[in-house]
Regions:
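N-terminal/domain-start segments enriched in small and hydrophobic, helix-friendly residues
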Residues: 1-6, 117
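Glycine-rich phosphate/diphosphate-binding loop of Rossmann-like nucleotide-binding domains
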Residues: 4-34
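Short glycine-rich anion-binding loops that position phosphate/pyrophosphate groups of nucleotides
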Residues: 9-11, 73-77, 81, 105-107
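A short helix->loop->beta-strand "cap" motif at the edges of active sites that frequently abuts
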Residues: 28, 94-99
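N-terminal beta-loop-helix "entrance" segment that forms/cooperates
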Residues: 31-52
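Glycine-rich phosphate-binding loop
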Residues: 50-88
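Mobile beta-alpha loop/short-helix "lid" or hinge segments that flank ligand
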Residues: 97-107
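Conserved small/polar residues in nucleotide/adenosyl-binding loops
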Residues: 108-115
Length: 120
């Protein structure tokens, strides 16, 4: 199984995912794909052997992955302070890979008793 973990910014979410995946699925091919060099470098510290950076790396590896994991923003154009390009978001969201999207603090700031309609 080929699992692509994608992250941007500092790559902390991706690194945590890769560390857990490496322990849980040692036979899986894990690929770290960052939107920037810092994110990729941090994810590579998890001990994976394959990593790539940038828009073309996202497009190329999205087509070949069985599973794509990362923060929710990887399927939203202009997310992560603009690091996710429309091309990246489309490549991740429209492929055949199963998606595992992790909600992050910026997407989970609602209090327990609030709903989205309370904010609108």
């Amino acid at each position: 199984m080929r699992i692509m973990v994608m992250d941007g910014q500092g790559g902390g979410v991706g690194r945590s995912l890769l560390e857990a995946l490496k322990e849980r699925f040692p036979e899986a091919e894990l690929i770290a794909v960052g939107t920037n060099a810092t994110a990729t470098a941090n994810m590579m510290k998890s001990g994976v052997t394959s990593g790539a950076t940038g828009e073309n790396a996202v497009v190329y590896n999205s087509k070949r992955a069985d599973v794509i994991m990362g923060p929710m923003g990887i399927v939203m154009a202009d997310a992560m302070l603009g690091e996710i390009t429309p091309t990246m978001a489309t490549a991740v969201a429209s492929g055949d890979a199963k998606l595992v999207l992790i909600p992050t603090v910026s997407y989970t700031h609602l209090r327990a008793h609030e709903t989205l309609s309370d904010l609108v």
